[in-house]
């Protein structure tokens, strides 16, 4: 892994060489989300967050994830994401990724197919993660609450942390 200060200095040098500007601060107030967010929250059994006109869920697993002997926190991309993009009149496009263990994969696929949510890809990110994780990307367009209800079955097939 290496010394964190040296790693950070190396990343900064690489970013400086690309002339990529630092990220702007997020707006202090998010634009309104033109969806029934209360209905989406009720269907998923948890509360999402507005972000740039989208309505998002970022859901951590209950498992402790270890990769190559190192603890991997949820903020390092081992979370399930559900994004709702308003399309008007209660319709949304959803996409994201569901993090699963091997025994969960078929249950999630069956739940998504039953809800008419398209599977985009199933893949993994690491060779040595424990438990072994798989990621499923999905996509659908329909009534936002209908999509949330369909997603709930898929999410319930995984070992997510309980809603707060």
Task: Identify the residue ranges that each predicted region occupies.
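Hydrophobic, ordered structural segments
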Residues: 1-33, 140-162
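Extended intrinsically disordered, low-complexity coil regions enriched in Ser, Thr, Gly, Ala
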Residues: 7, 72-77, 102-127
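Acidic/histidine-rich, surface-exposed loop or edge segments in extracytoplasmic proteins
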Residues: 87-95
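Surface-exposed aromatic
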Residues: 93, 130-136
